[in-house]
Amino acid sequence: MNKTLLTGLLCCSLSIQSFADQPLEGFTYGSVNAPTGKEWESPENLALNKEQPHAYFFPFQHLDNARKVLPENSKYWQSLDGDWKFHWAPDPDSRPKDFYQTEYDVSSWDAIPVPSSWNIYGIQKDGSQKYGTPIYVNQPVIFQHSVKVDDWRGGVMRTPPANWTTYKDRNEVGSFRRDFEIPQDWDGREVFISFDGVDSFFYLWINGQYVGFSKNSRNTANFNITPYLQKGKNTVAAEVYRSSDGSFLEAQDMFRLPGIFRTVALYSVPKVHFRDLVATPDLDATYTDGSLTVNAEIRNLDKKAIKDYK
């Protein structure tokens, strides 16, 4: 289906096609009861049940709201930023392994603001460090490694020299939990949770049920959590690892700061919705008139086929 709109000297063409579920290599989907614990050292596995990449946009209930641009102006978007319950561990073996279960008591845990880096937030007034050490390096990774093509095969838990920061805190793990409720006017819609930035790997649970995992710390991770929700109070748990196999590709000239460092939010869409949008502008040979081609992918998450949807 193609539609052409004329606005002044700008010609806009909208092309709509159905979404074909062809996941990128490394993205897997399915019902998994629990993680194996090896996902953060498995380069062939990029994500479980994470949405395929798409343009960054938000659902709005009305054109007037959309013109305000920011997602806070949509009733179908809800921020989860703020205080989360938090536990810090110096290595994976020391983490609280069952914290995601809703009956697990986290009342004595500290609160940490999201977004933030736990290394920075943990710096005390006297200069002591409650949640590990901020580490700066240039190109290298912060864990023991060798400069060779297949070095990633050795993983991130190798024993470094004793004077390295990661000798004592081998691979820090942050356990995050908080409660939330779904607005009543979201009934019948698909609900997603989005993590805009988590360094460098995390597992996700909703109401004690394992949802999936994500790598690639600088890109948004979206998960459809509709099947895991319940009426009233819901609980989200995220287990964040400082280092993972993805860290080999994220070795930049910067401080290495683990944590949930960008916004976390919920959003909802109708069963039939735009999954992705690609806008391509162009000018004619005289640079006088312009064209804008918008390719849109629509997706139907309903159990029945939809015809002539508008």
Predicted segments, located by residue:
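Bacterial N-terminal signal peptides
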Residues: 7-15
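Beta-strand-rich binding/interaction modules
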Residues: 206, 289-310
